[in-house]
Curated annotation (Swiss-Prot):
The organism's place on the tree of life at top rank: Bacteria
Record bears the keyword Transmembrane: yes
Pfam families: Glyco_trans_2_3 (PF13632)
Protein's organism: Xanthomonas axonopodis pv. citri (strain 306)
Name this polypeptide is given: Glucans biosynthesis glucosyltransferase H
Family annotation (NCBIfam families): PRK05454.1-4, PRK05454.2-1, PRK05454.2-5
Length: 645
């Protein structure tokens, strides 16, 4: 582990196949690292203040928490003026409690987004000596690029890896890197196809002895176990490992700068990039990637600003110090039965928290471009993945109290847990807001029709309820507005997003579509929370990478019940009062139209038609980097080959 460079071994004879491997692996000599399981009931924080923490990090965090508290306090004071005059009933007390929690949630996001906006506009936030505008540094150590895969199309997978390999080679520093395809594939025919495509890739690029492949015989602990198996067997040869996802693409320039950042900061354990979502073709994928490109930096720069050296890990497109990971990130199996017990699902948060406990700095560098991923093509695919994340995040309830964690690491987990509980909380807030005037005894449905909760609240509070609604919407939508302003201040990015008018139309359309889909997401996230609490496991399936191609029967199965429920709620509301139905309209319409909305946003032709009109454009489409062009070329060529799976 001295960091010196040695050539990658070029094997002339196949090493003995380990009992850990299935199929025919191609691997270098083993260089084991011990990776003990960590004890969550014992331990202490090794380094309280990191050398690489930005100046004034305490002030930054005081701003975030103090700003959240102050903004929430003002909103609660106004809400009390709505509820207090006639005393607070039980329902009103429940409403107030939910309001405090939910407004604090969006107020914290707002405070973070404001910090992110200032950082983006000021072009600040660079750290660790990583400057993309400086000449490419010369490396001194070896790094392994790890690409885990699970039942993926091997041709598509390795097309992306080939593009990365070629981009690294163009930096002139390929000798510092080895590449590993780490398969957890369980379908034997896909495993055989992986070996064929891997060998063809090595022949094509001359990668024998530098690109390696293995498939685990037992894929215990999923992706976390996959990476841990590699660390325990081969980690001793590589001071750093860069973790990719099956759809990840990164430029060689960015990879080299990440490695140099690790070499120049020996107390840093992890550097996380901000992957830009690209290659979307369906309407849903394109609106997601546009939102990520315009609002994403505001959010990412904001959290990086107050995370400091206690940043989080997102599981891919990040570089990790191998020894630090081995020493501190061995995950224990949680006590109890699934879904809360067993292997840690959302392993990345926990690994980052344990590494920080062990004394290593964790950083995010959102300004470093050249890191890419693909998003799910449809809302259905997003919600399937989200259900797994829901279980993984709620499982953190068993980890958040672990001994010795930094309080920011605990905050990461609490935010992850809270993200899923906000869905049922918003639903309850809406229902209680309707129920209070109906249950209060002051409404004579026979004499006071048409009944409207909005009219009731407005009349009982001299208009303060309207101000509460307006302020809530402003705080909720502020990141979009700030993202647009930042875009206007960057002429190059603005042109690449279609110009000021088209970008504004894109933001408006994205907001409308997101609002239509919000009730669907709220309902299904709420159902996911209750399923996890009831003990239902999410399972582990391969992700859809290309067009969603949802059939009408599949849409009916997924959203038919929600559509009927929305129509029923609309009919009941209309029977009480047309004004009540109008007030509930956004939620009712979103549920009732869930099937056509999901169908429309899942269409490739709709997304591509909007692209031709300049809507939802991103810079990577106007002027795509070479690595993305190459990956697309290779994937198109792979799609023309006879299917292997």
């Amino acid at each position: 582990m001295d960091g010196t460079v040695t050539p990658s071994p070029i094997t002339t004879a196949m090493p003995p196949v380990s009992a850990l491997d299935a199929g025919t692996p191609t691997l270098p000599p083993e260089a084991p690292l011990a990776m003990p399981e960590q004890n969550l009931r014992e331990g202490s924080l090794q380094v309280r203040h990191q050398r690489t923490s930005p100046p004034g990090i305490g002030v930054r965090r005081f701003y975030l928490i103090g700003g959240t508290f102050a903004t929430t306090a003002i909103a609660v004071w106004v809400m009390l003026s709505v509820l207090w005059p006639d005393g607070i009933s039980v329902l009103e007390g429940c409403l107030l409690g939910l309001f405090v929690l939910l407004f604090a949630w969006i107020a914290m996001s707002f405070a973070s987004a404001v910090a992110g906006f200032v950082t983006v506009v000021a072009r600040a936030g660079r750290k660790l000596g990583i400057d993309p505008e400086q000449p490419l540094p010369t490396l001194r150590s070896r790094t392994a690029l790890l690409m885990p895969t699970y039942n993926e199309d091997p041709r598509r997978l390795l097309a992306g890896l080939q593009a990365i390999y070629e981009s690294v080679a163009e930096t002139g520093q390929l000798e510092h890197f080895d590449f590993f395809v780490l398969s957890d594939t369980t379908r034997e025919h896909i495993g055989r196809a992986e070996e064929l495509v891997y060998n063809a890739l090595c022949d094509r690029v001359g990668g024998h002895g530098r690109i390696f492949y293995r498939r685990r015989a037992d894929n215990a602990a999923r992706k976390a176990g996959n990476v841990a198996d590699w660390v325990r067997r081969f980690g001793g040869s590589y001071p750093q490992m860069l973790i990719l996802d099956a759809d990840s693409v990164m430029t060689g320039d960015t990879i080299v700068r990440l490695v140099a950042g690790m070499e120049n900061n020996p107390d840093v354990g992890l550097i996380q990039t901000l992957p830009a979502v690209v290659n979307g073709q369906t309407l849903f994928a394109r609106m997601q990637q546009f939102g990520g490109r315009v609002y994403g930096p505001i959010i990412a720069f904001g959290v990086a600003w107050w995370h400091g050296a206690e940043s989080n890990y997102w599981g891919h497109n990040a570089i990790i110090r191998t020894q630090a990971f081995a020493d501190h990130a061995g995950l224990p199996s949680l006590r109890g039965r699934k879904p809360f017990g067993g292997h840690v699902l959302s392993h990345d948060f926990v690994e980052a928290a344990l590494m920080r406990r062990g004394g290593w700095a964790m950083h995010m560098v959102p300004y470093l471009q050249g890191s890419y991923e693909e998003g799910p093509p449809t809302l259905t695919d997003l919600l399937i993945r989200d259900r797994r994340w829901c279980q993984g995040n709620l499982q953190h309830a068993k980890v958040v109290g672990a001994k010795g964690l930094h309080w920011i690491s605990r905050m990461h987990m609490l935010i992850g847990i809270g993200h899923y509980f906000t869905a049922p909380m918003w639903g309850l807030l809406m229902l209680i807001g309707i129920g209070i005037p109906l249950a209060g005894g002051d409404i004579d449905l026979a004499g006071d029709l048409p009944f409207s909760p909005a009219r009731y609240w407005h009349g009982s509070s001299q208009g303060n309820a309207i101000w509460i609604f307006v302020c809530t919407m402003f705080v909720l939508l502020a990141p979009k507005l700030l993202g647009y302003i930042a875009l206007l201040l960057n002429p190059r990015e603005l042109r690449a997003c279609g110009g000021a008018f088209r970008a504004a139309v894109s933001i408006l359309l994205e907001t409308v579509l997101a609002a239509l889909m919000a009730p669907v997401v709220m309902y299904l996230q709420s159902r996911g929370v209750f399923e996890v609490l009831a003990g239902k496991d999410s399972g582990w399936d391969a992700q859809v990478r290309d067009d969603g191609k949802l059939s009408w029967p599949a849409l009916l199965r997924s959203y038919g019940g929600l559509t009927v429920f929305g129509l029923f709620m609309g009919a009941v509301a209309y029977a009480v009062s047309p004004a009540l139905a109008a007030w509930m309209g956004p939620v009712i319409v979103g549920m009732a139209l869930s099937i056509p909305v999901v169908a429309l946003t899942s269409l490739r032709r709709t997304g591509m038609a909007l692209r031709r009109a300049g809507i939802f454009c991103i810079p990577e489409e106007l002027d795509p980097p070479k690595v993305l062009v190459r990956a697309s070329e290779l994937r198109r060529a792979a799609a023309l080959e006879p299917s292997l799976i």
